A protein has these predicted regions:
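Exposed, low-structure sequence patches enriched in small/polar residues
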Residues: 1-376
């Protein structure tokens, strides 16, 4: 890892051959990524930030990249203009799913057995965030999405469906979102306002509207998502986090891809510092993240330095800094009840966790995740 801090310029690079950038999860297998962080501070603490990263998922042989930059033009109001471009998870639309199922009802094919990773997803997004008053932020943005088939389908499920799964899709989506944390405590680091904590939850809502006929865009639909989360500190390094969110697609006048902000697959295991709320499904199959036009999810995480290891291996507590219990629940029309229970432990060097999934209370698999904490 390379760290450079010279006057108003900072540079951090993970290094080309750095084993601490390796990770593992049951769904994705071994992962490896590279991260670079650059920042330049100007007068009145205005700051330019550049954060490119690239990662590879060995199990699926997929390369992910993201180039992101911010210009913090009004640090006392957390005003920042951001530009991001990259690729995300492959997927397909709910309409494609419905069409294929209709055509395959009388065939030997089964939806669950098909290879459903039909479309690569590339995007570019420009957004602006600013605080209107203490704890209340507004975010506006525009994004453009391009989805192209990973390959021309060899399956011929019926008239019309082959064309649907071999077509390119483009979406132009303006968004507006609001986030509010009542009685938000903060401090001023020079001109820069930094949030500290609040005894109340953070409530967020975002509206998006796909507009057709803009740069070849064909999407014509709406998306609404809401989220509430909070981290409650209980003293002695103990805390309880919860995270509840839901979303739906409205006014569906075109083919659309169920691409949610809060309900998405994570490809790279995060360090515990980047996993504050535990709001992630680790064992849920990738097909389900695109399978519905609406969802509701809830996650809870309890963290404490003395739990199972204190009971069964007291001598190990000097090496284990903290333990965590996870509980997650998902509802979608196509999957009315999915539950995950997890347990993890970690220290300043690594974190590891195990998760068990249940579909309608029936065992649905077990998996593990591992990530290094050093040099993150």
């Amino acid at each position: 890892t390379i760290n450079l801090d010279y006057k108003t310029t900072r540079l951090k690079y993970s290094g080309i051959l750095n084993p601490f950038q390796l990770g593992y999860s049951g769904r994705n297998g071994i992962t490896y990524r590279q991260q670079l962080r650059f920042s330049k501070t100007f007068k009145k603490d205005r700051q330019l930030r550049f954060r490119p990263e690239v990662g590879f998922v060995f199990k699926r042989k997929e390369l992910f990249f993201k180039f992101e930059g911010d210009w913090e033009y009004l640090p006392e109001k957390q005003g920042a203009l951001s530009l991001s471009l990259g690729n995300t998870n492959q997927g397909y639309s709910s309409k494609i799913m419905n069409e294929i199922n209709e055509q395959l009802k009388d065939s030997t094919f089964n939806f669950e057995n098909l290879d459903l990773e039909y479309f690569k997803h590339y995007y570019i997004e420009l957004k602006n965030q600013i605080e209107l008053f203490n704890g209340f932020q507004m975010t506006t943005g525009i994004s453009y999405h391009r989805r192209i088939p990973t390959r021309k389908s060899a399956i011929d499920p019926g008239d019309g469906v082959t064309e649907i799964i071999n077509e390119n899709y483009h979406d132009f989506i303006p968004t507006i979102g609001f986030s509010y944390t009542p009685r938000q405590y903060y401090w001023m680091d020079g001109y820069r306002k930094e949030y500290l904590y609040s005894y109340y939850p953070t409530i967020s809502i975002e509206f998006g509207r796909a507009i057709p006929s803009v740069w070849k865009s064909s999407g014509n639909y709406g998306r609404v998502e809401a989220d509430i989360h909070q981290s409650i500190y209980l003293g002695l390094s103990r805390r309880f986090n919860y995270h509840i969110s839901g979303g739906l697609y409205t006014a569906q006048k075109s083919t659309y891809f169920a691409d949610y902000r809060y309900f998405t697959r994570h490809n790279f295991p995060e360090s515990w510092g980047g996993d504050d709320f535990g709001g992630v499904f680790h064992q849920l199959g990738s097909v389900w993240f695109n399978a519905s036009d609406k969802y509701v999810q809830a996650h809870a995480m309890y963290e404490s330095p003395f739990m199972l290891f204190q009971l069964f291996k007291p001598e190990a507590t000097k090496h284990i800094i903290s333990e965590r219990f996870y509980l997650s629940q998902l509802w979608m029309p196509v999957k009315p009840s999915y539950t995950e229970i997890g347990y993890g432990f970690g220290n300043h060097i690594f974190n590891v966790a195990a998760f068990v999934g249940f579909d309608k209370l029936k065992y649905d698999g077990i998996g593990f995740k591992f990530a290094f904490e050093l040099f993150q």
